[in-house]
């Protein structure tokens, strides 16, 4: 997910994207805790995507 793609979305779409990412992060953490997650780098990717979305939401709210 690129930041340029996110800037084109509305705040409502970004909030929906954020909710989906938070759910995905929760599922990945549960898989990691139970030892079912083989691709642990997905946790890092999702965490950074959440940060990207939150940053764009904050910048749109301030503008």
Swiss-Prot record:
Disulfide bonds: none annotated. The keyword Lyase does not apply. CDD domains: Ribosomal_L29_HIP. One of its GO terms (molecular function) is structural constituent of ribosome. One of its GO terms (biological process) is translation. Keywords: Ribonucleoprotein, Ribosomal protein. Pfam families: Ribosomal_L29. InterPro entries: Ribosomal_protein_uL29, Ribosomal_uL29, Ribosomal_uL29_CS, Ribosomal_uL29_sf. One of its GO terms (cellular component) is cytosolic large ribosomal subunit. Belongs to the universal ribosomal protein uL29 family. This is Large ribosomal subunit protein uL29.
